[in-house]
Amino acid sequence: MKKISKFIISVIIFISFNLFNPIQKASAIGEVDWLLLKENNDGKEWVDLGSIRKIKDNEISVLTKYFQNPNKEKVKGETNLYVMRINCETKEYKDISVNGIPSFKAQWKTSNDDELIDVVIDKSCNEINT
């Protein structure tokens, strides 16, 4: 019983600290510079120009937003946020976070000629090189 009580108290303290931590709130607030890159029958793709960061020689990370147009499965459509890691030399990418949830097992892949992904890769790599 004592172990359960200690666990519950620890969880409450952890949640309270995260909810009421002014430093965390301040660092989470920031301006987003969304640029609509492309719109097609599948949806719309934006990139946050202020989020583009160089990681290694040919690798960058960038925050993107994708709105999937309504279809038979999703009547209202769906918006998702991705943190993409992009290799500008090979034009490969991996989604390292989706809607704030880390994807620890993300694998490098090509766009398979998806024009919305291609435009993100091209614009992001061009921005970091200018």
Task: Indicate where each model-derived feature is located.
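Bacterial N-terminal signal peptides that target proteins for export
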Residues: 1-11
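Bacterial N-terminal signal peptides
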Residues: 10-19
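N-terminal secretory-pathway/extracellular module detecting exported/lumenal segments
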Residues: 22-130
